[in-house]
Amino acid sequence: MLTLTHFLVLAAILFAISVLGIFLNRKNLIILLMAIELMLLAVNFNFIAFSHYLSDSAGQIFVFFILTVAAAESAIGLAILVVLFRNLQSINVEDLGSLKG
């Protein structure tokens, strides 16, 4: 049977992969957005695990709020990415400095 520890270890691994993805690849905006989404997924996984094992539905409610914010963040991030690609023909983070006025 799976215990709370199994879920917390899995969430910690997901979080570590996302932090590693952010630190190792700082040039590509798409990968940065995916790593941030993976980080939010790990947090949601913790909320669901604690909610299940403590028999409290508050964690599941928080997950819905976090998913809503993550969807809005993804939509705004991808819209900014499309505008950046149209203007600069690149999605590198280093090219953002040329947009300063």
Curated annotation (Swiss-Prot):
Designated name of the protein? NADH-quinone oxidoreductase subunit K
- GO terms for MF: NADH:ubiquinone reductase (non-electrogenic) activity; quinone binding
Naturally occurring in which organism (per UniProt): Chromobacterium violaceum (strain ATCC 12472 / DSM 30191 / JCM 1249 / CCUG 213 / NBRC 12614 / NCIMB 9131 / NCTC 9757 / MK)
Compartment list: Cell inner membrane
NCBIfam families for this protein? PRK05715.1-2, PRK05715.1-3, PRK05715.1-5
Q: Which reaction does it catalyse?
A: a quinone + NADH + 5 H(+)(in) = a quinol + NAD(+) + 4 H(+)(out)
Cited HAMAP family: NDH1_NuoK
Q: Any one Gene Ontology biological process term? A: ATP synthesis coupled electron transport
For this UniProt record, the keywords arranged alphabetically read as follows: Cell inner membrane, Cell membrane, Membrane, NAD, Quinone, Translocase, Transmembrane, Transmembrane helix, Transport, Ubiquinone
Assigned EC number: 7.1.1.-
Residues crossing the lipid bilayer are 4-24, 30-50, 61-81
Q: How does it assemble?
A: NDH-1 is composed of 14 different subunits. Subunits NuoA, H, J, K, L, M, N constitute the membrane sector of the complex.
Q: How does it sit in the membrane?
A: Multi-pass membrane protein
